[in-house]
Protein backbone atom coordinates (compact mmCIF):
# COMPACT_ATOMS: atom_id res chain seq x y z
CA UNK A 1 0.00 0.00 0.00
CA UNK A 2 1.36 3.41 -0.97
CA UNK A 3 1.78 6.19 1.61
CA UNK A 4 0.81 9.84 1.36
CA UNK A 5 3.49 12.20 2.69
CA UNK A 6 2.98 15.81 3.77
CA UNK A 7 4.60 18.44 1.58
CA UNK A 8 8.04 19.69 2.62
CA UNK A 9 6.80 23.28 2.94
CA UNK A 10 3.01 23.04 3.26
CA UNK A 11 0.64 25.99 3.19
CA UNK A 12 -2.59 26.29 5.12
CA UNK A 13 -5.54 25.74 2.78
CA UNK A 14 -8.94 26.56 4.26
CA UNK A 15 -11.11 25.46 1.35
CA UNK A 16 -11.76 21.96 0.01
CA UNK A 17 -13.74 20.93 -3.06
CA UNK A 18 -16.83 19.08 -1.91
CA UNK A 19 -17.60 15.62 -3.24
CA UNK A 20 -21.04 15.19 -4.78
CA UNK A 21 -23.16 12.22 -5.81
CA UNK A 22 -21.81 12.54 -9.33
CA UNK A 23 -18.15 12.67 -8.21
CA UNK A 24 -16.34 9.49 -9.30
CA UNK A 25 -15.56 7.29 -6.29
CA UNK A 26 -11.96 6.97 -7.37
CA UNK A 27 -8.95 6.85 -5.03
CA UNK A 28 -7.54 10.01 -6.64
CA UNK A 29 -10.56 11.96 -5.41
CA UNK A 30 -9.90 10.78 -1.85
CA UNK A 31 -6.14 11.11 -1.96
CA UNK A 32 -6.16 14.76 -2.95
CA UNK A 33 -8.34 15.53 0.06
CA UNK A 34 -6.24 13.39 2.40
CA UNK A 35 -3.18 15.23 1.13
CA UNK A 36 -4.76 18.58 1.96
CA UNK A 37 -5.64 17.47 5.50
CA UNK A 38 -2.15 16.08 6.03
CA UNK A 39 -0.50 19.27 4.77
CA UNK A 40 -2.73 21.43 6.98
CA UNK A 41 -1.89 19.30 10.02
CA UNK A 42 1.84 19.62 9.38
CA UNK A 43 1.55 23.37 8.79
CA UNK A 44 -0.35 23.98 12.03
CA UNK A 45 2.07 21.81 14.01
CA UNK A 46 5.05 23.75 12.63
CA UNK A 47 3.41 27.06 13.54
CA UNK A 48 2.74 25.84 17.08
CA UNK A 49 6.37 24.81 17.48
CA UNK A 50 7.55 28.19 16.16
CA UNK A 51 5.39 30.12 18.64
CA UNK A 52 5.58 27.88 21.72
CA UNK A 53 9.18 26.86 22.17
CA UNK A 54 10.22 24.25 24.72
CA UNK A 55 11.67 26.69 27.25
CA UNK A 56 10.93 27.86 30.78
CA UNK A 57 9.68 31.27 29.63
CA UNK A 58 7.21 29.82 27.13
CA UNK A 59 5.91 27.14 29.47
CA UNK A 60 5.52 29.64 32.33
CA UNK A 61 2.97 31.47 30.17
CA UNK A 62 0.56 28.59 29.55
CA UNK A 63 -1.84 27.09 32.08
CA UNK A 64 -3.02 23.58 31.22
CA UNK A 65 -3.93 21.70 34.39
CA UNK A 66 -3.42 18.16 33.03
CA UNK A 67 -3.26 15.11 35.30
CA UNK A 68 0.16 13.55 34.69
CA UNK A 69 -0.14 10.83 37.34
CA UNK A 70 -0.69 7.97 34.88
CA UNK A 71 1.07 9.64 31.94
CA UNK A 72 4.66 9.90 33.20
CA UNK A 73 6.52 8.52 36.19
CA UNK A 74 8.16 10.94 38.62
CA UNK A 75 11.53 10.06 37.10
CA UNK A 76 10.26 10.78 33.58
CA UNK A 77 8.82 14.14 34.64
CA UNK A 78 12.12 15.10 36.26
CA UNK A 79 14.08 14.03 33.17
CA UNK A 80 12.05 16.51 31.10
CA UNK A 81 12.69 19.19 33.71
CA UNK A 82 16.42 18.60 34.06
CA UNK A 83 16.81 18.69 30.27
CA UNK A 84 15.58 22.29 30.35
CA UNK A 85 12.97 21.70 27.63
CA UNK A 86 10.01 21.03 29.96
CA UNK A 87 8.50 19.13 27.04
CA UNK A 88 4.78 18.44 27.54
CA UNK A 89 4.87 20.05 30.99
CA UNK A 90 2.87 23.20 31.67
CA UNK A 91 1.82 25.33 34.62
CA UNK A 92 -1.05 23.72 36.48
CA UNK A 93 -0.21 20.17 35.44
CA UNK A 94 -0.16 17.86 38.44
CA UNK A 95 0.59 14.39 39.74
CA UNK A 96 -0.28 12.59 42.97
CA UNK A 97 2.12 11.00 45.44
CA UNK A 98 1.66 9.30 48.80
CA UNK A 99 3.69 10.21 51.89
CA UNK A 100 3.79 8.95 55.47
CA UNK A 101 5.00 11.03 58.42
CA UNK A 102 4.90 10.93 62.21
CA UNK A 103 2.91 14.17 62.05
CA UNK A 104 -0.01 13.04 59.91
CA UNK A 105 0.40 9.38 59.02
CA UNK A 106 -0.35 8.40 55.43
CA UNK A 107 -1.78 10.99 53.05
CA UNK A 108 -2.03 11.92 49.38
CA UNK A 109 -0.25 15.02 48.13
CA UNK A 110 -1.27 16.49 44.77
CA UNK A 111 1.85 18.16 43.37
CA UNK A 112 1.09 21.08 41.03
CA UNK A 113 3.71 22.48 38.65
CA UNK A 114 3.79 26.14 39.72
CA UNK A 115 6.60 27.46 37.49
CA UNK A 116 9.81 26.56 35.68
CA UNK A 117 13.35 27.80 36.39
CA UNK A 118 11.90 30.47 38.70
CA UNK A 119 15.11 30.51 40.78
CA UNK A 120 17.56 30.07 37.89
CA UNK A 121 20.96 31.61 38.72
CA UNK A 122 19.69 32.92 42.09
CA UNK A 123 21.55 32.63 45.39
CA UNK A 124 24.96 33.38 46.85
CA UNK A 125 25.84 30.08 45.14
CA UNK A 126 24.16 30.22 41.73
CA UNK A 127 21.30 27.74 41.30
CA UNK A 128 21.96 26.42 37.79
CA UNK A 129 19.94 23.22 37.77
CA UNK A 130 16.80 23.30 35.66
CA UNK A 131 13.85 22.94 37.99
CA UNK A 132 10.11 23.06 38.41
CA UNK A 133 8.52 24.65 41.47
CA UNK A 134 5.96 22.35 43.10
CA UNK A 135 3.12 23.69 45.25
CA UNK A 136 0.75 21.16 46.83
CA UNK A 137 -2.88 21.71 45.83
CA UNK A 138 -3.89 21.53 49.48
CA UNK A 139 -2.27 21.79 52.88
CA UNK A 140 -1.01 18.68 54.59
CA UNK A 141 -3.81 17.20 56.68
CA UNK A 142 -2.27 18.11 60.06
CA UNK A 143 -2.33 21.70 61.30
CA UNK A 144 0.74 23.25 62.88
CA UNK A 145 1.85 26.28 64.85
CA UNK A 146 4.70 28.52 63.76
CA UNK A 147 5.90 28.59 67.38
CA UNK A 148 4.56 27.17 70.63
CA UNK A 149 4.12 30.69 72.01
CA UNK A 150 3.11 33.95 70.37
CA UNK A 151 6.60 35.17 69.48
CA UNK A 152 8.54 35.55 66.23
CA UNK A 153 11.97 35.51 67.85
CA UNK A 154 14.64 34.51 65.35
CA UNK A 155 12.36 35.18 62.40
CA UNK A 156 11.44 32.36 60.04
CA UNK A 157 14.69 30.47 60.73
CA UNK A 158 14.03 30.63 64.47
CA UNK A 159 10.54 29.17 64.17
CA UNK A 160 9.38 25.70 65.18
CA UNK A 161 7.92 25.38 61.70
CA UNK A 162 11.35 25.79 60.10
CA UNK A 163 13.33 23.75 62.62
CA UNK A 164 10.97 20.89 63.45
CA UNK A 165 7.89 20.61 61.21
CA UNK A 166 9.12 21.17 57.65
CA UNK A 167 12.12 18.80 57.94
CA UNK A 168 9.70 15.94 58.65
CA UNK A 169 7.74 16.67 55.47
CA UNK A 170 10.95 17.25 53.50
CA UNK A 171 12.18 13.75 54.32
CA UNK A 172 8.86 12.13 53.39
CA UNK A 173 8.54 14.08 50.14
CA UNK A 174 12.13 13.34 49.15
CA UNK A 175 11.46 9.62 49.56
CA UNK A 176 8.20 9.75 47.59
CA UNK A 177 9.87 11.75 44.81
CA UNK A 178 12.88 9.44 44.45
CA UNK A 179 15.28 12.10 45.79
CA UNK A 180 14.39 14.57 43.03
CA UNK A 181 13.90 17.56 45.38
CA UNK A 182 16.69 20.05 44.67
CA UNK A 183 18.36 22.14 47.35
CA UNK A 184 18.86 25.81 46.56
CA UNK A 185 20.05 28.86 48.49
CA UNK A 186 17.71 31.56 49.79
CA UNK A 187 17.82 34.55 52.13
CA UNK A 188 15.72 33.80 55.22
CA UNK A 189 14.94 36.00 58.21
CA UNK A 190 16.97 35.27 61.35
CA UNK A 191 16.17 38.13 63.75
CA UNK A 192 13.26 40.32 64.83
CA UNK A 193 13.31 43.75 66.46
CA UNK A 194 10.48 43.80 68.98
CA UNK A 195 10.32 47.57 69.45
CA UNK A 196 10.26 49.14 65.97
CA UNK A 197 7.27 49.73 63.72
CA UNK A 198 6.27 47.02 61.27
CA UNK A 199 5.52 47.76 57.61
CA UNK A 200 2.28 45.86 58.19
CA UNK A 201 0.54 49.04 59.31
CA UNK A 202 -0.06 51.63 61.98
CA UNK A 203 0.15 50.38 65.54
CA UNK A 204 1.83 47.06 64.66
CA UNK A 205 5.16 46.62 66.44
CA UNK A 206 8.06 44.34 65.61
CA UNK A 207 9.79 43.63 62.31
CA UNK A 208 12.29 41.24 60.72
CA UNK A 209 15.72 42.82 61.17
CA UNK A 210 18.25 40.43 59.65
CA UNK A 211 18.68 37.50 57.28
CA UNK A 212 21.14 34.78 56.24
CA UNK A 213 21.70 32.58 53.22
CA UNK A 214 20.34 29.09 53.92
CA UNK A 215 20.00 25.82 52.04
CA UNK A 216 16.33 25.20 51.24
CA UNK A 217 14.54 21.97 50.39
CA UNK A 218 10.95 22.56 51.52
CA UNK A 219 9.89 26.07 52.46
CA UNK A 220 6.81 28.15 53.21
CA UNK A 221 5.76 30.59 50.50
CA UNK A 222 6.11 34.36 50.72
CA UNK A 223 3.32 36.88 50.23
CA UNK A 224 4.79 37.93 46.88
CA UNK A 225 4.96 34.35 45.63
CA UNK A 226 1.24 33.95 46.32
CA UNK A 227 -0.29 37.41 45.80
CA UNK A 228 2.29 39.15 43.61
CA UNK A 229 3.00 41.84 46.24
CA UNK A 230 3.64 42.25 49.93
CA UNK A 231 0.57 42.74 52.11
CA UNK A 232 1.63 42.52 55.76
CA UNK A 233 5.35 41.67 55.55
CA UNK A 234 7.14 43.54 58.32
CA UNK A 235 10.23 44.66 56.35
CA UNK A 236 12.29 44.04 53.22
CA UNK A 237 14.06 41.22 55.07
CA UNK A 238 10.90 39.14 54.64
CA UNK A 239 11.21 39.19 50.84
CA UNK A 240 14.76 38.10 50.03
CA UNK A 241 14.80 35.92 46.90
CA UNK A 242 11.03 35.40 47.03
CA UNK A 243 10.38 38.50 44.95
CA UNK A 244 8.23 37.26 42.06
CA UNK A 245 4.79 35.69 41.93
CA UNK A 246 4.69 32.03 40.97
CA UNK A 247 3.23 31.64 37.45
CA UNK A 248 0.59 29.27 38.87
CA UNK A 249 -1.06 32.01 40.93
CA UNK A 250 -0.71 34.58 38.15
CA UNK A 251 -2.50 32.33 35.65
CA UNK A 252 -4.94 30.64 38.05
CA UNK A 253 -5.41 32.92 41.09
CA UNK A 254 -8.24 30.73 42.40
CA UNK A 255 -5.60 28.18 43.40
CA UNK A 256 -4.43 30.48 46.21
CA UNK A 257 -7.21 28.87 48.22
CA UNK A 258 -6.37 25.44 49.64
CA UNK A 259 -8.06 22.72 51.66
CA UNK A 260 -6.92 20.99 54.83
CA UNK A 261 -5.72 17.63 53.56
CA UNK A 262 -6.17 16.28 50.03
CA UNK A 263 -9.47 17.62 48.65
CA UNK A 264 -10.41 18.79 52.15
CA UNK A 265 -12.49 21.81 53.14
CA UNK A 266 -10.73 25.14 52.67
CA UNK A 267 -8.40 26.26 55.43
CA UNK A 268 -5.92 29.07 55.98
CA UNK A 269 -2.20 28.34 55.69
CA UNK A 270 0.99 29.92 56.99
CA UNK A 271 3.31 32.12 54.92
CA UNK A 272 6.89 32.80 55.96
CA UNK A 273 6.71 36.57 56.52
CA UNK A 274 7.08 38.05 59.99
CA UNK A 275 4.27 40.56 60.61
CA UNK A 276 5.06 41.65 64.16
CA UNK A 277 6.80 40.56 67.34
CA UNK A 278 3.97 38.06 67.86
CA UNK A 279 2.55 37.15 64.44
CA UNK A 280 3.32 35.67 61.03
CA UNK A 281 1.45 36.15 57.76
CA UNK A 282 -1.02 33.66 56.38
CA UNK A 283 -3.33 33.20 53.38
CA UNK A 284 -6.97 32.86 54.37
CA UNK A 285 -9.76 32.45 51.81
CA UNK A 286 -7.59 34.10 49.18
CA UNK A 287 -6.97 37.20 51.31
CA UNK A 288 -3.80 38.13 53.17
CA UNK A 289 -3.94 38.31 56.94
CA UNK A 290 -1.87 37.52 60.04
CA UNK A 291 -2.17 35.29 63.06
CA UNK A 292 -0.32 34.97 66.35
CA UNK A 293 2.48 32.44 66.02
CA UNK A 294 0.84 29.79 68.24
CA UNK A 295 -2.24 29.53 66.02
CA UNK A 296 -3.06 26.22 64.33
CA UNK A 297 -2.62 26.84 60.61
CA UNK A 298 -2.28 24.79 57.47
CA UNK A 299 1.13 23.79 56.13
CA UNK A 300 1.43 24.37 52.37
CA UNK A 301 5.10 24.75 51.40
CA UNK A 302 6.81 24.69 48.03
CA UNK A 303 9.88 22.88 46.75
CA UNK A 304 11.87 22.47 43.55
CA UNK A 305 12.28 19.23 41.61
CA UNK A 306 14.49 18.28 38.70
Locate each region found by the language model:
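Extracellular "spike/adhesin" assembly and maturation modules
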Residues: 1-49
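Collagenous Gly-X-Y triple-helix signature in extracellular proteins
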Residues: 53-306
Amino acid sequence: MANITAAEHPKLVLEMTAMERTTPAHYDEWNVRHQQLLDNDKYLNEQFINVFSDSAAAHNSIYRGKNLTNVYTVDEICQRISAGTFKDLYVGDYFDISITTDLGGAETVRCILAGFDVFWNNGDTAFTKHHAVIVPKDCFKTKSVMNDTNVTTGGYVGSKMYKTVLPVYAAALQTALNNHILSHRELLTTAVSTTGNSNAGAGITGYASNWEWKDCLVKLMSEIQVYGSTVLSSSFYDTGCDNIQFPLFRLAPNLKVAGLGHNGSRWWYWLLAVVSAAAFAFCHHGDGSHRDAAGDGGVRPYFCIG
